[in-house]
């Protein structure tokens, strides 16, 4: 073992299979705490290959599309170090398709079974007398449904309101306004189920009060009583935030068509590209896993898919709720995936004030050049950003060419914190169709 600052003892490798108990002792001037942790040494890592669902609370991995419109399939992986990929459609291996993301374009209506076999491309390694690390392979399948209709067949005629009419899901990341029952946060303390969280968010938006999305990856999904058409080069809809000069907390915009016609946001999400799309520092498919704190008024720990780790600070000077981890998330950890922008927050060394700088265009709650006139630029009240459906892109960055949309998802697009201001967290107030 070796001593490492902030970590204690670091143990390298056990040579025998089995479950080992590691005892951790932590002490300071206030006393000593002891905790036992079980570590299992296994012969083969529990490799996982699975396809994602359209949102955290949904369970089906089925994908929907129209004939000649591609879907981009990318499995989630656990424990792989050097994965190799093999794709097949209805049992036929797709020669040359060896990347993690597979572009599948059905030419005719029907159901297709797409399989991805992932192997650990590592020569057999003798770890110890009883433990070998060798090649393993895991297969996951996903059903792709090519619906028997044209895109225009799903367009829903203009409804009675130009405003959003329903919140379908509210899954924020941990943050200082989550579970907050003061007049600032506005929660009641009874938001202990996804349904209750949606009801709360619905009422907040009706009152045009802010709904916080927490740290990176937190999101809200809303819909309208009609489809919003692609008007060409004009702004098709807008989202109200509270950005002002020096206070931008950008939210990524995703849109969806109700391809399967069931009235639910369980189809394909398309990102609306903004000014940062395609830049080297912008990371697609970025994952952050948040962990439930073991006690009250504690920071929320996280790890990210690029190997970083950190925490969402608990700000005891400003908020009194026990936990920043959403009370309606039953699991002890959850992972949020999306597009992550490079942070633009800086602190003035003289005054100590933080500046959350803006991005050019394409993001919610952002003091960019796509703002709709009418909002205050002093405190952000009524601040709105305009968005074009023509900016919808596929996962590979190519244009999606959508004729209309039915659902909108806003997702916090930055993993950062600004000292005493707390985490960078997108806030939304309202959604409006600008084509009516």
Where do the PLM segments sit?
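Single conserved hydrophobic/aromatic residue that forms the stacking wall/gate
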Residues: 1-11
